[in-house]
Amino acid sequence: MGACEPPNFSWVSEGRLAALGMPREPGHYRFLLAQGVRHLVSLTERPPPHHGCCPALQLHRFRVPDFTPPAPQQIRSFLQLVEEANARGEAVAVHCMLGHGRTGTMLACYLARAQGLSGSDAIREIRRLRPGSIETREQEQAVIHFCQQAGAGEDSKEL
């Protein structure tokens, strides 16, 4: 069986961090490996199907209920994982069910840190790159709170 692109796949930082919806078949994992992805971060409460089919792709589980934001410690752990993997030349991909809400929240925090953006600017940028990202006010607030805690700029304006 060959590789096939997973749903809603795109690079947020080429060769470093990608996003996608839930991978559902072995070809999706082979596609990720072919793209240089070595770490798959799953934000869903259940593990993705067939995740054991490609042992070279390490699965990292961060259980976040649908339509809720990741906890601050989950965001920090995710960003550390991305930083450490990238330092070794390894790409990371992150997914939730559709690759929008929980995934978008993590990606906006990544962009805020990587590009020095405020929370609202990071949210706008991830929505430009991946339309539909960040689905709830609580997810928006998680990004803004992360940025305030990280000193990435004062940010309390409405989006």
Enumerate the language-model features and the residues they cover.
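Cys-dependent protein tyrosine phosphatase-like superfamily
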Residues: M1-V92, M106-L159
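Conserved G/P- and acidic residue-centered "switch" motifs that form tight phosphate/ATP-binding loops
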Residues: G99
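Ser/Thr-glycine-rich phosphate-binding loops at phosphate-binding pockets of nucleotides
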Residues: T103
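Short cysteine clusters
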Residues: C96
